[in-house]
């Protein structure tokens, strides 16, 4: 007799768990009227009173997001590790020569010089900059040192390699 109340309590507890378990209320139309049925929480409704156990991984968007982020991270890390372990070979560049050009000497006062008209002599050919304050600001006087000085040639040591360290230290 003592076992009977334990069985009844277990049965009532099982019924209570069955009733309180999360369930899905599903419905479908049969003719013109809806028909209702219940599926468990881990099942999906499929219509016509059937419940399908669904693998809910397709509904876990965060799982797919983290999976894609992990794949991208691994690919990026592999790329950087490969670049560090096997660096690309250095390409030898051809010797870089710098050539200097001299400005031609100033021609006579009547010859036209190339360049924008505002930078010419006010009495020479070109536009008259009287009404233009910007042209007046950038105009050079006719006998200014900036307009008539030719650049000197570059020093001779520019095209040679630097002297050795010992020679420089001994010179001091």
Swiss-Prot record:
Interacts with WWOX (via WW domain). One of its GO terms (cellular component) is late endosome membrane. Residues 102-153 are annotated as: Disordered. The keyword Transmembrane helix applies. Residues 23-60 are extracellular. The keyword Transmembrane helix applies. GO terms for molecular function: enzyme binding. Residues 1-22 form the signal peptide. It is a single-pass type I membrane protein; Single-pass membrane protein. The chain crosses the membrane at residues 61-81. Coiled coil: none annotated. This is WW domain binding protein VOPP1. InterPro entries: VOPP1 (IPR026229). Residues 104-119 have a biased composition (Pro residues). Keywords: Cytoplasmic vesicle, Endosome, Lysosome, Membrane, Signal, Transcription, Transcription regulation, Transmembrane, Transmembrane helix. It comes from the Eukaryota. It is found in: Cytoplasmic vesicle membrane; Late endosome membrane; Lysosome membrane. Increases the transcriptional activity of NFKB1 by facilitating its nuclear translocation, DNA-binding and associated apoptotic response, when overexpressed. May sequester WWOX in lysosomal vesicles and thereby regulate WWOX role as tumor suppressor. Residues 82-172 are cytoplasmic. Its main location: membrane.
């Amino acid at each position: 007799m003592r076992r009977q109340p334990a069985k009844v309590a277990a049965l009532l507890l099982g019924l209570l768990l069955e009733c309180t378990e999360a369930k899905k209320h599903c419905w479908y139309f049969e003719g013109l009227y809806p028909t209702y049925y219940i599926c468990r929480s881990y099942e999906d409704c499929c219509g016509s009173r059937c419940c399908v156990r669904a693998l809910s991984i397709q509904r876990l968007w965060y799982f797919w997001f983290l999976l894609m982020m992990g794949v991208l991270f691994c690919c990026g890390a592999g790329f950087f590790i490969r670049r560090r372990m096997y660096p690309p070979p250095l390409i030898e560049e051809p010797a870089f020569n710098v050539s200097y050009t001299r400005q031609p000497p100033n021609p006579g006062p009547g010859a036209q010089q190339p360049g924008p008209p505002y930078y010419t002599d006010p009495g020479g050919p070109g536009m008259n900059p009287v009404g233009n304050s910007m042209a007046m600001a950038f105009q050079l006087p006719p006998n200014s040192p900036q307009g008539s000085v030719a650049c000197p040639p570059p020093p001779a040591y520019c095209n040679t390699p630097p002297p050795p360290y010992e020679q420089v230290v001994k010179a001091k």
